[in-house]
Amino acid sequence: MCAKPNHLFVTVTFIFGFAVCIVQISAWTSIGKIAIKDGKCDPKNGKLYSIGEKWHNNEDCFEITCIQGNKGTVAQQVTSCPVHAMKTGCKLKFPKGEFPNCCPFYDCSKN
């Protein structure tokens, strides 16, 4: 008698593998609290941002968006650079500029 393949195991394995691939090519996003002033996001950089407005932290290469929080509050949604798997023989570069141009990348041109 032959054993039947465990379709649940195969499906879960496929989904996990697919998720790992997505993580390696996608930026991450997180949501957190931020100071509020006059109903706007106050990142303490001298400017106030309305819901939907974006600003950048080019030193750490983030894009931040002021979003509607819970119960009438505001929050910040932080988007960062994609995470890349290490590439053998390539050099990791850290360019300057505004997000997403400041995101690190692998330079494989000398291969």
UniProtKB/Swiss-Prot annotation:
Contains 4 disulfide bonds. Keywords: Disulfide bond, Secreted, Signal, Toxin. Its main location: secreted. One of its GO terms (molecular function) is toxin activity. GO terms for cellular component: extracellular region. Residues 1-28 form the signal peptide. Expressed by the venom gland. It is found in: Secreted. Belongs to the scoloptoxin-16 family. This is U-scoloptoxin(16)-Sm2a.
